[in-house]
Structures are given as C-alpha cells and as structure tokens.
Amino acid sequence: MLFRSGTLPYSVSIADGLRAELADAGTEVTAADGADLVVLRATDGIGEFGPFRHQDWGTSVQCPLPVHTLQSVENGKYLTLTGEGDTEIEALADTPDGWFVKELWEFEAVSGDGAAEGLAGEPLLLRSNAPHSRKYARIDRATGRLVADAENPADATRFSLEPVTSGIHEASELAASADRVVLVLGNDPHINGRETVDRDGLALPPQQERLLHEVLTANPNVVLVIVSSYPYAIDRAADQVPAILWTSHAGQELGSAVAHVLTGRHNPSGRLPQTWYSGSAVLPAREDYDVIGSGWTYRYSRAAHVYPFGHGLSYATFEYRSPAATVREETPGALTVVADLTLANTSAVPGHEVVQLYARRIAAQDPSADPNPESEAARTLVGFERIHLGAGESRKVTFEVPQERLEQWSAEKSAKLLPAGEYEFEFSRSSTDPAATVRLELS
C-alpha cells in the first residue's frame, strides 16, 4: 500500500490465496518470487554481506535511475539507511516504504558509465537512491559495518554481486513442472508508481520481461496477473498468454480476491479506467498539452493500443438488443436524450456487464458555426451502468443524458454550446467496441 493508505492489519499473498482456495480440491500450489539469491562481496576482500534476495525493480520514481532491493535471508528484512543522519546501512526494514524510500539501491558502474547490471564478478558501487542521501556505501574498516557516507566514488567500496541461485531459473524450472502457471508481475507504488514523476516508458522492467519470456518458454499455460498503479505496454504478452488479469494494489485480501477470480468463484466485471497503449513511441510528447491536436486521451487518440479505455471481460456473455433513443425537451433550449436497450445474459452463469454509452457528432447542420470542428469525431463517454443478470436473464437499461454532457466550449462566445447536427449514440463494451448504435438529430 502507498504511504498515505495506512498500515494493513495483515496481508494475503496471491500464492496463499490460491492455496486456501484450492485446498479442498487437493491441488498443490508451489511458488517462487523470482528473486536472485546473492552475496555482496568487497572486491578487495575486506568483507562480505548476505545472502540477500535481490530484486531488480527497473526505474525508481524518486531519483529516476534503475534500482534494486536487497532482502536479508537471515531475518527477512530489507537493507535500509538507519542511524543518525541515515549514514548506517542495516537490514531492518519490513518493506520499502515512505516518501523518501531508503531501501532502494543503485548499482553504479565503477567506470562511471552509468548503471551496472550486477553481473557476477562485475565491480560496482552501491549508492543510495534516497534523494536526501545519494551517498555511496563503504565498509568501515574499524567496525566492519556497512555505512553510507561516501560523497564520491573514489571513497566508496567496490563490490561484486556474487550469485548463489538465479530467481528466473528457479521460476522457469518450477513452471516447467506445473500444470498451470500464475505469473505475477507489476510495480510497487513506493518504488516506481506515484504522483510527481512521469515514467520514461511503458515497458515492464527488463528483469520482469526476462522472467515472462523464460516462464512462457518453460510452460505456455500461463495466467498473467499484473498488479500495478498504471498501464504497461504488453503487446507480446497479449499475443502469447492465454489469460491476463489486471488489478490495482488493493488491500489486505488482494490474494484472496485474485484467487476467487481465477477459480471462477467470483465473476469479474472490472473495466480499465485508462487506455493501455502499445508503447511510449506512439504517444505525443509529454509536454504537449494540446489534447485535441496531439491526440491525448481515449477521445482523440489514434495511437495503437493493446487494450482500450473501458475494456474488461467476464465469464458470462451478453447481447445488446433493440437500441433506441428519443429527445425530451426539459425547458426551452434544454434537452435530455433518453437512450435504452435490452441487455441479455446469453450464458449459463450469472454476471455483471458494464454498459457504456458514448456519443459523437457525425455531421454538423452548419459547419461554419461549429465551435470545435476538429473534435467532431471524438467519442465521449456520457453514461455507464453496471448491470447484474442471472443466467438467461434480460433487462431494459435506460440512460438519461442531459444536454450539458453533449455541449462543447465555444471560444468565440465564451460559453458551452450544443452544436446542432446528427449524433450517434453507441452502446459499447469499451471505447472502441460498440455493440449497438442509434442516431438522432439534435438542434
């Protein structure tokens, strides 16, 4: 959970959630965390520390550089800054936490040419990623302890990260011996997902990309679970993985909730609150705030995407039948569009469907009077309803769309206006998947 969210009273992991859910069926659930087991050793032989479980998290948001965590095998705690002035380094933290995360470490190349990969025998410098520190680690020769007080690389201890076991190899071996694989990827909101900092890209961290590749190679029967604060570019996974489930970081029962969805005990009905694009290269420049001209948001973007805004699946199937729309005049110059259809559950299981209503103007009565001609084809979400239907059940779904949801800003008149013309109303499963449409003339 994020630093503003309080402290969880307990936490159910996805592995433990699956164990509990599948216990009565006698299904064995085994797990590996994908972390490498390593020893941190001074290259001049004056000391070594560990073993640690090493995770490569990709780019940090507090100082945008590749970062790592080192979790002690002995006590399960993370290597963190402690002591007066945060100049001591000890394995005392339960989790990476806080606004300034003191459990993140950079592996800096001794050559000064950027980040080191932590390869066996490769000399590296250990540097705190915490903005208030940014100090290099060294071994205090008098005490033999790790401290973080070196201002420059010349005063820092050179280390090598000596591998004991490979986390990716362990995970791929486990996958090869399994009937089904649940692979969990994503981010930690303390490390690489919070406000104030934009990401440099949409790709998964390189270590997670490698893990995904090796696990899929070992066993293609994979369900990919992404626990994240934001979208990723997962084109390859979408093409190769049979099923993908996304969730936010949720709360203490995250593991139980995921297990209930994967086993079918709970029928999912969530919808994506943002578009998942195919990569950052297809997006406009981050500093370009011309939303319409540059093609930002689901309304104006023509960029290639993996999943559109509003996308989501269910174990149930639904049909959209008999769409209709009428105009109701409330007062002179103010109208309401009443749109309805019949929604039918055509499957053998109960479920929820999120019916989304989008509106777009397809032809102006007077193009010269159009307050915003470049946004003519933009779809706008004007309503949605989450409907529960039993197996074989059907129900009428009605939307009432007030005029202000259809109005556009006129810079010339400094007011919001309803452009007269022909409008299309789409009953959709997502922003790009209309299931039924109706047209109305509005003036």
Q: What are the roles of these predicted feature ranges?
A:
Residues 10, 30-85, 103-143, 160-174:
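Extracellular glycan-recognition/adhesion modules and their associated mucin-like linkers
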Residues 65, 332-334, 389-394:
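Solvent-exposed, conformationally flexible loop/turn segments
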Residues 140-142, 344, 402, 428-430:
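Beta-strand-rich extracellular modules
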Residues 367-409:
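Intrinsically disordered, low-complexity Pro/Gly/Ser/Thr-rich segments with frequent PxxP/GP/PP motifs
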Residues 405-422:
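Short glycine/proline/serine/threonine-rich loop/turn segments at secondary-structure transition edges
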